[in-house]
Design a protein with these regions (language model features):
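N-terminal Rossmann-like NAD(P)+-binding domain of SDR-like oxidoreductases, especially those catalyzing
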Residues: 1-158
């Protein structure tokens, strides 16, 4: 039975609020995967249905290996999400938003797990012309482009 939902970035603002919502509205067990680079342990919700794992999205296949068959859906919020800082920490932005997110996409595609991906106005704003304004916006735009291609190539549903 697929009774687990995964939330990457589960200790950030959006992820922690989503976890609370899922606890209130569903009976699923929840796994939060967060590297705590911007999320906080203060955002953890004390509930027996939630398991918090410290780790990077690039390692998702190894980290969740034992739970693959039980995962229903994955909500991906665990990306580097700071526009200004993406200029100062471009390597970290690319590691998270390109390498980590690619691992998430492949994990979901390979294991037929539903993906809910969070886009951003930084890459969608101004009719998509803002995608080259920062490393952050660029990586998010490329991820959306990759998702569209995965949909065409493999009928990947997200």
């Amino acid at each position: 039975m697929k009774n687990i939902l995964v939330v990457t970035g589960g200790c950030g603002f959006v992820g922690s609020n989503l976890i609370q919502y899922l606890l209130d509205k569903t009976n699923y067990k929840i796994i939060s995967l967060d590297d705590y680079s911007s999320g906080s342990k203060k955002n953890q919700i004390n509930n027996s249905r939630v398991k918090y794992i410290k780790g990077h999205t690039k390692d998702i296949g190894t980290i969740l290996k034992r739970n693959i068959k039980k995962i229903n859906s994955l909500f991906h919020f665990g990306e580097f999400a700071r526009i200004y800082q993406s200029f100062l920490q471009m390597d970290r932005c690319i590691q998270s938003n390109t390498i980590g997110t690619n691992a998430i996409f492949n994990f979901c595609l390979k294991n037929k797990i539903k993906l809910i991906y969070s886009a951003t106005s930084a890459s969608l704003g101004n009719r998509g012309n803002d995608r080259n304004l920062s490393p952050y916006a660029f990586t998010k735009a490329k991820n959306l482009e990759l998702l569209e291609n995965l949909k065409k190539w493999f009928d990947f549903k997200y």
